[in-house]
Amino acid sequence: MKGTKGKVFRVFTAFLAFVLFITAYDLTKGSEKPEDIHNTSLLRNSCFFNWLESKKTRGITMAEEKKANQLPDRSEVKAEDTWRLEDIFPSDEAWNKEFQAVKELIPNLSKYKGKLADSADHLYEALTYQDKVMERLGRLYTYAHMRSDQDTGNSFYQGLNDKAGNLYTQAASATAYLVPEILSIEEDKLQQFILEKEELKLYSHAIEEITKERPHVLSEKEEALLAEASEVLGSSSNTFSVLNNADITFPSIKDEDGNEKQITHGNFINFLESENREVRKNAFDAVYKTYGQYKNTMATTLSGTVKKDNFYARVKKYKSAREAALSNNSIPEEVYDNLVKTINKHLPLLHRYIALRKKVLELDEVHIYDLYTPLVKDAGMKVTYEEAKDYMLKGLAPLGEEYASILKEGLENRWVDVYENKGKRNGAYSSGAYGTNPYILMNWHNNVNNLFTLVHEFGHSVHSYYTRKHQPYPYGNYSIFVAEVASTTNEALLGEYLLNNLEDEKQRLYILNHMLEGFRGTVFRQTMFAEFEHLIHTKAQEGEPLTPELLTNVYYDLNKKYFGDGMVIDKEIGLEWSRIPHFYYNYYVYQYATGYSAAQALSSQILKEGKPAVDRYIDFLKAGSSQYPIDVLKKAGVDMTSPEPIEAACKMFEEKLDEMEELLMKVKQS
């Protein structure tokens, strides 16, 4: 969605931008999963977009696959371990009754079409009526999609989900006139409307977000033509998605036990994590040999998407596709440049980490396929769900009593759907709507990763709780630029708590490695993605064809730069660009690195300053989209227009690397 059309969705459409907040955790962990998609947001708001894409991600492990048929039916799961969706609608009958009531309201959504410029009253009434309908529609959809996700084999709830989605489409169509018509009103007249009708001040920031796009809005006929062409212009991305997810198949290789096993998108990561190096290498070679057979097609689809991005930017009178993409959240381009420049400056830290990996794994040389096998085993760290709740409450205690009370409310009032059952969707997410509790989907396993996942998702949920409680409906959402800050701050606080309180040194090593890998995947890797993305958009804008050879060489050279001379950069990795769905969502991934860095800065302030930093942070959680993301973060204590947060995050990585090296030496000598 671009330009005017995008603003309809981002500013006013609750369904995408702020009614539903879903963040699939597996997609936010630095894309270390082979199906790394993000995702990720709003235009592509972090919520709904992540959820849709996550339907394709995160396979189950080989052991889990064997157990899949032993999972209980949904009806056999204890009620106390499920989310209490009855708090949204007490019954399916109540949902259907509300559905019919909202359906009858849809035709009136367009009753003010052609009348917004007539008076302040008409403008206000159109906006408030739209909000009331979309708020109710958001609750309908949230209930339906979560009922569907708890058992994807339940055709009744799949039907509810489809009905809610179709109703939303009707509502979106009926309100599509709003933004173009607001833009047709002269600025002086809009300001006069706001002055003469006090209630319109509620929408002043939202209207400002729309009107700042005036220089980039075309004539009505031109905008209509672009809208008509959007499906055609998006065909490259659709072709990639079908090819990558439906048509490409990988060969079989022998697993650790000598059994033939076919590689899939879902289990590729399990092969790469294998302790058997031959298994890792064979999986790596097989996957990239397969992608090599499709490199010409993949180059065509990626080139088509980049051309589309550059085309939209050009006709909308932006200097570049990057400026166009970042303008959606009013992010200065210097934020992007600061990230790339600062991370490049600190690449020796990544080189040092690779050297440590080589030493610990006792390898003569480190290859790309050696990056994923665990550096440190879990040291027997089995964590039950009950233990995880205790860890979470203690680890997040620095955020204060009010924050703790919200966590307890969520745990006690069944915000979390805890365990696996047959048909339940994979992964984890936080969801909800304005006027409902936040909800969390988990598929609990007794390990540290699930502990961090739970804390991560509660970060999103408490963020949503504060935002919806303290902001009116038009601002009861938040952009992806700040979304991952809240979840990652929680992870950082938990990590520090565990490091300070675990007595077993091997367990502390495991936590340190978890934190270092998180940084490598979320900051170093995503910044490399961001650098690649900008390079190919720039080359295409300058008229250079994006051939498979060019794409492969650019990507290979970036890997050489990022990983350094201490690592063998296998030629196959040059083809990784061909399987990354990120690159079809222009200028999106940099936000993972900036969000992670902001979270590290905020968590450090919270632990060092105490209450003043906590108060700023809670105000940040309450702000929603009432201000621009950059401004919200500045008030919290982090200025992302400067390199300082990235510098501070790199300093944290260095300190954790020091600590791990020292602890490894100590454990080895004991």
Curated annotation (Swiss-Prot):
**Gene disruption: observed consequences:** Inactivation of the gene does not cause any detectable phenotype in sporulation growth conditions. Deletion does not affect cell growth in rich or minimal medium.
| Catalytic activity, EC | 3.4.24.-
Q: A single GO molecular function, which one?
A: metalloendopeptidase activity
Q: Where does Zn(2+) bind?
A: H456, H460, H463
Does the keyword field hold Membrane? no
* SUPFAM superfamilies referenced in this protein's UniProt entry, alphabetically: Metalloproteases ('zincins'), catalytic domain (SSF55486)
The family database entries (PROSITE patterns) matched by this protein are listed as: ZINC_PROTEASE (PS00142)
The superkingdom of the source organism is Bacteria
PANTHER family, per database record: PROTEASE M3 THIMET OLIGOPEPTIDASE-RELATED, SACCHAROLYSIN
What this protein is called in its record is Oligopeptidase PepF
- Gene from which the chain derives: pepF
